[in-house]
């Protein structure tokens, strides 16, 4: 059983048959070895007790009730004086019934069986390692053809006669017909190989280091050839090079994890603990069983039939043996991944059986729903809404959620400040929502980040840290620039909020997970906090400098005509309105706030002389002279005031309040980055 305090991670991979046997086999106090499931039965229909050596056997998986054996005898668990520790009649140990949650069994397969995940899933690991087409391997696994054994050291009858090539489709129909079971088995063990056993032999004969060396040499040779000019040939070479890279990476992974390639072919099939595939009795005496039990029964039935053909019958044609091996392979495929080879297996009500893959994968699978999707303490969930006034690293938490998440911290603060004598008094103050509670909550939240998560968490930016602030309402406020990392929008999306408790978690959240420290995509390095949608429209309206706004465009001529009519009627206004001059941006924004000018009204703003805007060859549109000798050179977007000696006195640029506001925001941001950089250096 996994100790949650000693194990911090879980790795899924291939294991050896010896490891499977060690997990599932146990030795009883009388020296008897149990663990192999040999019968396809579950419960006896009369006694309603598990069948011996069946899928729910108490000898293999442990007692159903703690300390009670199959005979009904009782022993105190953990009492060393009680002897013996198991029932001598039924062989059931007197242990805790929770052992049935983790005690495994195994099925000894009569023939090797290829693990369908490694064969049929793309990319096929077995096909990559053997460097053979997937169709050819499938035909070999499912006994569609055979081949002469390439690893036999002794000269064989077929090799001496030279009658057959590497692959011969007709062997399937010719050879088995002339051999009985015993003769065919001897002939096959020496002369030919078929089924998953052939795959296992080839995988066992592989040298992974030689595969890496040969693949690298071939990759370099293909790279030296260069482009041939033929597009089809170049693509073929490119696909081959990609395949060699995948093959090298796969071989390195096997070496690094100490996994042998032949472990991808099963000789022992693990049987899940009974509590993970239960049979439940419902009202009316009916039984509900996990689909995996029926799939296990199918495997055991076919495996026992094959065992009988190989051991008891001596006159069975070899063709029947090969056919039964194929049925065992298909039964194990259905158990591991139902429907991967075509039509899935269904029950009497035309319902598809749920295999291991269906139980594990997907949103409702074991990992995402049960292990990763469990409800946890110090967490909440609510709809997100836009918070444009928030900083990039802040989020708005509703008061209702915040007081629940930080309740223990608030209680500690109330007791430390002697505002409550005990926990009960502190909780009553929180229920009554006294003003002092919100003050302490503000103090607690200032130094405590929170984690926001939006499912599905597909990459690192799916969970980010924020500094929480209290907001009114019942929705979480989020800065719009962080939405792309979460793949979120404000059309009803929900996000979960978590409170990191330990000091290590808080440090990790502050140093690695804060939103303003994750501005680039971890996948491609491009900026991920970029304005989109509403922000782009707002920037356009802010800097358009157009009285018509965004409602008029070339696709809406009606409004343009109305605007032109309005412009003709108010021609005198446009003709005689004087554009105001401002010495600095503060005066311009102040005039806008006093409603003396509009957001898009053109104006002249004095510019600094050190920031030149003059084009070298640009000529003025108009020149105005004054009586004192100064004159104004008017250009398209700026104006220059010169003295009598043509010295530049002032420079004005033609802009709007919207442009000024955007420029000031950008300037403040640049100055902030500069200060932060200077502090860092």
UniProtKB/Swiss-Prot annotation:
Binds 1 Mg(2+) ion per subunit. Binds 1 Zn(2+) ion per subunit. It catalyses: RNA(n) + a ribonucleoside 5'-triphosphate = RNA(n+1) + diphosphate. It comes from the Eukaryota. In plastids the minimal PEP RNA polymerase catalytic core is composed of four subunits: alpha, beta, beta', and beta''. When a (nuclear-encoded) sigma factor is associated with the core the holoenzyme is formed, which can initiate transcription. HAMAP family: RNApol_bact_RpoC1. Keywords: Chloroplast, DNA-directed RNA polymerase, Magnesium, Metal-binding, Nucleotidyltransferase, Plastid, Transcription, Transferase, Zinc. Belongs to the RNA polymerase beta' chain family. RpoC1 subfamily. InterPro entries: DNA-dir_RpoC_beta_prime (IPR045867), RNA_pol_asu (IPR000722), RNA_pol_N (IPR006592), RNA_pol_Rpb1_1 (IPR007080), RNA_pol_Rpb1_3_sf (IPR042102), RNA_pol_Rpb1_clamp_domain (IPR044893), RNApol_RpoC1 (IPR034678). GO terms for cellular component: chloroplast; DNA-directed RNA polymerase complex; mitochondrion. Zn(2+) binds at residues 69, 71, 87, 90. Pfam families: RNA_pol_Rpb1_1, RNA_pol_Rpb1_2. DNA-dependent RNA polymerase catalyzes the transcription of DNA into RNA using the four ribonucleoside triphosphates as substrates. It is an enzyme of class 2 (transferase). GO terms for molecular function: DNA binding; DNA-directed RNA polymerase activity; magnesium ion binding; zinc ion binding. It comes from Solanum lycopersicum (Tomato). This is DNA-directed RNA polymerase subunit beta'. Its cofactor is Mg(2+); Zn(2+). It is found in: Plastid, Chloroplast. Mg(2+) binds at residues 489, 491, 493. GO terms for biological process: DNA-templated transcription. Its EC number is 2.7.7.6.
